[in-house]
């Protein structure tokens, strides 16, 4: 599958970005993944997205001298080689991966349109969180996209034992401004960094 790699520095981490052309994907492209046989029942689009994410992950692992690839869990989640933690995200024809020696979460989303923001608002934020977004000085569709993305990154950055007992709506927005934001999960606070890359929003959480 044809793809292009870009390296994005964010919050002291190196994010590997893969822009890929799904039209060039062929099923045999998956053969370099040890578990490729388990992907045969997936649709072509999902296979291409998965491959792009694992290519990004391979580059991320290579940066720390790790030659092993992530395995795949029973929920299709990446299982990172010990002692590493990592995160993968994809949106459209772009995939990201980041690796660290502690839990880390990355997410990429296409910026919501005003119409989509109005449709999704009630499923992403509470009335109190909406007040915080409106006071942030950021355009509401951007702020809502950031909040959604941040909660995704926050969940990914939780230790697997914690993930089993929490959901998206357990995270609460504590503060948001240009370049960074804060979430709360019970009594724990998560600090995140974010950037805007064209039509995309990228958030990174490293508790």
Which positions does each model-derived feature cover?
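Core catalytic alpha/beta fold that binds nucleotide/phospho-ligands
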Residues: 1-207
